[in-house]
Amino acid sequence: MARVAARLSTDGKQSTHPVDEVLPLPKLALYGFQHVLAFYAGAVIVPIIVGSALKLSPEQLVYLINADLFTCGIASIIQAWGIGRIGARLPLIQGVTFTAVSPMIAIGLGAGGGTAALLVIYGAVITAGIATFAFAWLPAKAFRTVMRLFPPVVTGTVITVLGIVLIPVGLNDAAGGLGSPDFGEPKHFAYAGGTMLFILVLMKLGRPFLSSIAILLGLVAGTAVAFLLGDAKFGDVGKSDWIGVTTPFHFGVPKFEWFPIVLMLIVMLITMVETTGDTYAVGDIVGKEVDSETVARALRADGAATALGGVLNSFPYVAFAENVGLVRMTKVKSRFVVVAAGVFMIVLGLLPKAAAIVAAVPHGVLGGAATVMFAMVALAGIQTLGKVDLKEEKNALIVGVSLAFALLPATVPVFFSKHMDADLSSLLNSGVTLGATAAIVLNLIFNGLAKDDAHGAPEAGARALGEAEADTAPGSGTDADAIVPEASAPEAPAAVPAQAAAPAPSAAKADDADPTPSPSAP
């Protein structure tokens, strides 16, 4: 019997969970565009950095940016809308992972730079994407065993590391953008500070709707002021083409070489930890239970998007932590807002003029908004860690030492360039890579594999709450996750009386593919 993803209100009527609510079109457009603006700087910086390092021409660089935006849109729609058992059906934006930047540059320079280097990179990206996609289809028991590597102490640490590592990215934008001739000029900090203050005032004093679009309004207001003062340049809009279509294998047929493939597989292992943490974090923010099948669907979307990225001249994809911070700030939980953002990104990828308008937002303005969002990402990680018993010395050591490792590349970069070869340095010279690896290894040393209920055992609570109806129709494309009250502690009892667990009846949560208990959101 088909199960409806719904929750019961106090009068017994079914109501749609906020995640599955389709907002009116004007709100969808506004909220979706806000996600695009929040995501844009982080999205385009990877092709810019990689393309510049490989000495691509300006025209080739523009093509990379448009291809990235186009693929980001498709990937985000797959993740948020869902296709059968692919996609988490949560408000998760997909973007190119920063973790892959150094390895891709190393691969590209090793291949001689230019478009020939892109072909080697794309071969590795396609292979790693297919491998990730295949991994996420492991049998439920095997997949749950792997997911036990990521209890809250690991996912919370990784999300916190992401926020801490990303904050300097926002601050560099606030200073005018790395490499700009006037980097560090006071006017950039003035734009950043003014934008940040505008956002904070709206969040504090604005009505709920204004608060929910505070980032968008802050970016618009900051850009308007910069334009009036002559610091927002829209000249490139007129020079850009109206239409720019992304075609598969634009630069040629990919080349598949073993070492770049191995390097990219390691990168995807780290992005899997990122996506797992982001999935649990956004599930916690929106009040939607996350189990092992939800994580598997999110990782399948990652793998599919990464393989598609290699075909469409882009790079590896991950659930973007920046937009998790935005969901937390705005409290807009609908996944269809992300679908709308995906449509906007596809349009931007097809319309270079539209992309040029967004690109005209000054660095200082972007930096002010980005710093707020990245700080919220770190806070989401800290919130997850709040559900971990940090009074236990072993957990405190896992978090503290992992954070210390994550800061190593930023504080002592010479260690990697001076004492490691280029290939190893490109892999380890990343705060996210070191922090995530340290968290996983230290957790295994101190805690071993987590129990199946390490993320709160919502499935056990669902059984106690009653009536689990399984929807086993494959490829239905509907969200089969019903809503149960959130666990109030990280380790909920495996079974409690229904009367004590929930005074009001609620639809139980059953997994489409696996009726057995599995990990859930912290």
Regions found by a protein language model. Name each.
Residues G431, G435-A501, P505-P522:
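Terminal cytosolic tails of multi-pass membrane transporters
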Residues L109-A232, A340-G456:
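Membrane-embedded alpha-helical modules
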Residues Y63, R85-A100, V146-V154, L210-L217, ...:
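Short, non-helical or kinked segments that cap or interrupt transmembrane helices
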Residues A2-L92, T99-G114:
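N-terminal signal-anchor module of multipass membrane proteins
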Residues L25, G51-R89, L263-R335:
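Membrane-embedded helical hairpins/re-entrant loop segments and their flanking transmembrane helices
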Residues G12-Q14, P18-V22, L30, F198-V201, ...:
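Hydrophobic transmembrane alpha-helices of multi-pass solute/ion transporters
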Residues A5-K13, A43-P47, G51, G194-L205, ...:
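Juxtamembrane interface elements at the cytosolic ends of transmembrane helices
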Residues P26-F39, A43, G184-M196, I213-A214, ...:
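Hydrophobic, membrane-embedded alpha-helices of multi-pass small-molecule transporters
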